Amino acid sequence: MKKVYATGRRKASIAKVWLTPGAGTMTINGLSLDAWLGGLEAKKLRVKQPLALTKQDTSVNIVATVLGGGFGGQADALRHGISRALVRFNPELKAILKPEGMMTRDSRVVERKKPGKRKARRSRQFSKR
């Protein structure tokens, strides 16, 4: 029985993903996908996207631990981790996932606040007179 491990990242979130051949169950932080994400349907679809594209949704079991960030970052980190695990499980799937951008780590992070400004770029209100 082949067990594959991969890590996915997005913003401040890190997803540790273990993938094994099985019936298609998905456990995240000890919960099912529906219990973990609740009513966030768009994020559920995003997490399932690599499995749907490669038609592996009923042939692999996924156990994942996700840390840090919010639900959006965690869902995208999990998607990245699942994609990387699928490619380690079956290298032929890279040809499907790479053009869809699922193998690429989204490196966008929050820009830091600068001194003398209210936010990263927002300046204080300027009064000409």
UniProtKB/Swiss-Prot annotation:
KW 4Fe-4S (keyword) present: no
Any GO BP: translation
Biased amino acid composition, Basic and acidic residues: 104-113
Top-rank taxon, per record: Bacteria
UniProt key word Ribonucleoprotein: yes
Family matches, as SUPFAM superfamilies: Ribosomal protein S5 domain 2-like
Signal sequence annotation: none
Gene3D superfamilies noted in UniProt: 3.30.230.10
PANTHER family linked: RIBOSOMAL PROTEIN S9, SMALL RIBOSOMAL SUBUNIT PROTEIN US9M
UniProt similarity note: Belongs to the universal ribosomal protein uS9 family.
NCBIfam families per the UniProt record, alphabetical: PRK00132.1
Name of the featured protein: Small ribosomal subunit protein uS9
Organism, as annotated: Sulfurimonas denitrificans (strain ATCC 33889 / DSM 1251) (Thiomicrospira denitrificans (strain ATCC 33889 / DSM 1251))
Gene expressing this chain: rpsI
